[in-house]
From Swiss-Prot:
It is an enzyme of class 1 (oxidoreductase). It is a multi-pass membrane protein. One of its GO terms (biological process) is long-chain fatty-acyl-CoA metabolic process. GO terms for cellular component: peroxisomal membrane; peroxisome. It comes from Drosophila melanogaster. Its main location: membrane. PANTHER family: FATTY ACYL-COA REDUCTASE CG5065-RELATED, MALE STERILITY PROTEIN 2-RELATED. Keywords: Lipid biosynthesis, Lipid metabolism, Membrane, NADP, Oxidoreductase, Transmembrane, Transmembrane helix. GO terms for molecular function: alcohol-forming long-chain fatty acyl-CoA reductase activity; alcohol-forming very long-chain fatty acyl-CoA reductase activity. Pfam families: NAD_binding_4, Sterile. This is Putative fatty acyl-CoA reductase CG8303.
Length: 543
């Protein structure tokens, strides 16, 4: 069980209050619960309210909810109204994705959009819709958030903190609340060092005061970056800061209610469910790096070679969320339960190994085309900066011409735009990839041991058995298939294309040396020119 601790302080976990009435059953607020239920049995006939349902995690969550039981109830998905497509069209497009192909129209009709704003009181719902939700909803999954590390503090507070408060307010109004699950992040405590416990670490600021501040226009006049740093202090960005505030808020508000916090680390594609290698649009998070790498657009990373990159399959995050819904919904708990969904403690993968795996993987499964040979390497400091400007940014500016003329490259944005995003993302992730963060799995392992035998394989979230090479293979093939719309099958044509491109790649080094040799020997003479040509060429190869 989780309690608020002072920056890493440890307190004993309060015991479960079973209020037993025999046969593994107990009552909460007049509702009979049973610890003997399987996970599908728990979700049968349950009506669910989901925020963040149109995002990558949310989409996989909706599919997983539909998959739990044929008799699952209505899945209400919060959708913003002011978008390119109206809410019904957005949900229709979402349900056309490959992961929903196996479901009938009748089953898909259970997914219902509800238009609202996350930070508005009662989400801005009309009285009839609000009453329907109060009467019918049993489970809330809250994953909506602004995940941009560079989000202005006011925006992050309104979305991540106030938005969480709105879901809590709804949960407290529900007539039959069975479970409330908040999707946080393992990095919400990245301002701490050592082993991060599955507990809520006390924030330096009152979440209620921060919400009031977000609504006070005068507080944001002349609000500089320096003032922002005064608030987030030792947090690396507004995202982790407001996620920690949200956890503090949830602990204060949800005592005695069936609530849980799930903290995933760096979320990648799916390992098994709903299909191998599902990556969504591959635009968000670290998956965007893999998408750029597949085409040879991104070819460098910065970070400590020995630092653990704590990645986790998306379906493990969803499985842990479903398990936590079942767990808190079948027991009487005194405090919200917290688990990490991470891999670093049980199956560590360091950055050097990660780079080797993705280089080997793309060689086994090359795409239809590249901008340049996909090969990535760790660099730091001036070496990283020089390589980025010489071999990323400068070529991207030149590449604008063939992009426009022949339509090659990555979808949606130009290579130059991707480079700008890549540079910002690299700086943001550098904080996390240059340090060793360790996350306790004590609660996660304890709860996973309670999963009914019949559910353990389907709802597994134990990363200790993950084969990272196979997993990265699936992610890269998924990016080819779902993002670049290429065939997932690697043929002899792909392998021959890779061999030809390799010849051109190494021939490029010969051409560079020849240009340097002739240019320098003509101007400086044979001895000096040759020496300089070898030195410059060797430096570029090393770089």
């Amino acid at each position: 069980m989780a309690v608020i601790t002072e920056h890493g302080g440890t307190t004993s976990s309060p015991p479960e209050n079973n209020n037993s009435i025999g046969n593994g059953k107990h009552r909460v607020n007049g509702h009979q619960l049973s610890t003997s239920l399987t996970i599908p049995e728990f979700f049968a006939h349950k009506n669910i309210f989901v925020t963040g349902g149109t995002g990558f995690l949310g989409t996989v969550l909706i599919e997983a909810l539909l998959d739990t039981h044929p008799d699952i109830g209505t899945i209400y998905v919060l959708v913003r109204g002011k978008r390119k497509f109206d809410p019904n069209e957005r949900i229709r497009r979402l349900l056309q994705k490959p992961i929903f192909e196996k479901y009938s129209e009748k089953t898909l009709s259970k997914v219902v959009p509800v238009v609202g704003e996350l930070s508005e009181p009662n989400f801005g719902f009309g009285p009839e819709l609000l009453q329907e939700l109060i009467d019918r909803v049993n489970v809330i999954y809250h994953s909506a958030a602004t995940i941009k590390f560079s989000s202005p503090l006011r925006t992050a507070i309104r979305t991540n903190l106030t938005g969480t408060m709105r879901t809590i307010e709804l949960a407290k109004q529900l007539k039959q609340l069975a479970a409330y699950i908040y999707c946080s992040t393992a990095f919400c405590n990245s301002n701490n060092r050592g082993l991060i416990a599955e507990e809520v670490y006390k924030s330096q600021f009152d979440p209620y005061e921060m919400m009031k501040m977000a609504e006070d226009d005068s507080a944001w006049e002349d609000f500089t970056d320096q003032k922002c740093k005064g608030y987030i202090r030792d947090h690396p960005n507004t995202y982790t800061f407001t996620k920690n505030l949200s956890e503090n808020l949830l602990m204060a508000e949800m005592s005695g209610l069936p609530a849980a916090i799930v903290r995933p680390s760096i979320v990648y594609g799916t390992l098994e469910h709903p299909m191998k290698g599902w990556v969504g649009n591959a635009n968000s998070g670290h998956l965007g790096f893999l998408a750029g790498f597949v085409k040879g657009i991104f070819r460098t990373m910065c970070g400590n070679a020995n630092a653990v990159i704590d990645i986790i399959p998306c379906d493990y995050v969803i499985n842990s969320s479903l398990v936590m819904g079942w767990y808190v919904g079948t027991r009487k708990l005194e405090q919200p339960e917290i688990i990490h969904c991470t891999s670093g403690e049980v199956n560590p993968l360091n950055l050097a190994e990660f780079c080797t795996i993705i280089n080997d993987s793309v060689e086994r499964h090359p795409p239809n085309s590249f901008v340049w040979k996909p090969v990535t390497k760790l660099r730091n400091g001036w070496r990283y900066n020089l390589f980025f400007y010489l071999f990323h940014l400068l070529p991207a500016m030149v590449f604008i011409i063939p992009e426009k003329l022949f339509g090659i490259g990555m979808p949606q944005h130009t290579a130059y735009e991707y480079m700008r995003v890549f540079q910002k993302g690299t700086k943001a992730f550098d904080y996390f990839l240059d340090k060793d963060f360790r996350y306790s799995l004590k609660n996660a392992l304890r709860i996973s041991a309670l999963i009914p035998e019949s559910d353990r394989r389907r709802y597994n979230f134990d990363a200790s058995q993950c084969d990272w090479s196979e997993f990265i293979d699936r992610c890269l093939i998924g990016i080819r298939r779902f993002y670049f719309k290429e065939s997932a099958v690697t043929t002899d044509w792909h392998r021959n294309y890779w061999k030809v491109f390799n010849v051109l790649y190494y021939a490029g080094y010969v051409v560079i040396f020849a240009v340097l040799y002739f240019a320098l020997t003509l101007t400086l003479g044979l001895q000096i020119g040759l020496t300089l040509a070898v030195l410059i060429w060797g430096f570029l190869v090393w770089l």
